[in-house]
């Protein structure tokens, strides 16, 4: 892949509308709500002794801003200028822009940062997985710049492989069917077409299960060279694999979770009813965190596998 991971990510995430669309995910998709609520709980209970943080693949600042509100100085690091611009806007609105340093860069190169530069290092919503085939090296570099705690979420193999046999999986998590988000409208308008065109392909499932790759690497590279904007080649981790990588780089007291493992069992009609009632929503998200933190379900999170540990 050489440096294709960086080039593909740069083209994908620097599309002009990325900042606005990503900033609205929690108003659009229920799985995003569940995942981010889980991470927020984990962060807020792990800030003892934390004064500085590095947010790798920080996007629109969902967690950079959260930590800055707690008085922490955050380095917001992302490959996308539209995302950074949106994060700056939101940080200004929240009154915490003076506590955030915005840096444009790729996770494949963290050489600008010295060992143990940050009390807390975090990287959420799978940017590590988008660095294939450099994902292990990137984890090692994130650990290297960590002084106290590291928290990451990567693409989950056990959580994602089933979706090769479910082309309408995202429909389950649509919160607002009237959303103008192009992805929402595509999910709704193409639902019957996706069902009609589906056929079970055992070979593709076995290949994804064994390799951690749900897409064809060479076809993705070809699409990029032809001027298209393909989705990043994404590496999906097994739980024990991720834990062993972290251990190899010296991380201790590791725990894993699968945000979305409980929510994925509930139909859209019920999920929407829960989300639209503040009391039910709060109780639901609290229970999701408890259930999804059970190590026996960590691999079956909606898309992501969460890990935290200490240096």
Question: Each predicted region: which residue ranges?
Answer:
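A short glycine-rich, Lys/Arg-flanked "PGG" loop and its adjoining helix->strand segment in the class I
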Residues: 136-149
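Class I SAM-dependent methyltransferase SAM/SAH-binding core
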Residues: 62, 66-97, 101-109
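A short acidic, Gly/Pro-enriched loop at the edge of an enzyme's catalytic core
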Residues: 112-120
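Conserved class I S-adenosyl-L-methionine
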Residues: 1-48, 50-57, 62, 151-212
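A short SAM/SAH-binding and catalytic strip from SAM-dependent methyltransferases
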Residues: 120-134
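Short alpha-helix
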Residues: 233-250, 256
């Amino acid at each position: 892949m050489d440096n294709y991971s960086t080039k593909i990510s740069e083209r994908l995430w620097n599309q002009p509308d990325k900042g606005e669309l990503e900033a609205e995910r929690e108003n659009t998709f229920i799985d995003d709500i569940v995942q981010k609520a889980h991470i927020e709980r984990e962060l807020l209970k792990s800030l003892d002794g934390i004064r500085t943080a590095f947010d790798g693949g920080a996007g629109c600042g969902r967690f950079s801003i959260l930590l800055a509100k707690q008085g922490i100085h955050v380095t917001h690091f992302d490959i996308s200028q539209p995302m950074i611009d949106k994060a700056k806007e939101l940080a200004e609105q929240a009154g915490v822009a003076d506590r955030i340093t915005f840096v444009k860069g790729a996770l494949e190169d963290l050489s600008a940062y010295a060992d143990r530069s940050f009390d807390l290092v975090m990287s959420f919503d799978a940017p590590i997985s988008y660095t294939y085939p450099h994902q292990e090296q990137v984890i090692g570099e994130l650990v290297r710049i960590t002084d106290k705690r590291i928290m990451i979420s990567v693409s989950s193999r056990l959580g994602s492989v089933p979706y090769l046999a479910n082309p309408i999986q995202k429909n389950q998590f649509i919160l607002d069917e009237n959303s103008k988000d192009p992805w929402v409208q595509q999910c709704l308008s193409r639902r019957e077409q996706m069902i009609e065109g589906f056929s079970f392909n055992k070979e593709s499932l076995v290949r994804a299960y064994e390799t951690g790759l749900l897409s064809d690497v060479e076809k993705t590279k070809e699409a990029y060279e032809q001027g298209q904007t393909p989705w990043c080649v994404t590496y999906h981790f097994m739980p024990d694999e991720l834990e062993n990588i972290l251990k190899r780089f010296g991380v201790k007291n590791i725990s894993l979770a699968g945000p979305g493992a409980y929510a994925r069992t509930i139909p859209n009609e019920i999920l929407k009813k829960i989300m639209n009632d503040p009391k039910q929503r709060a109780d639901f998200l609290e229970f999701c965190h408890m259930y999804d933190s059970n190590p026996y379900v960590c691999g079956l999170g909606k898309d992501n596998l969460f890990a935290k540990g200490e240096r």
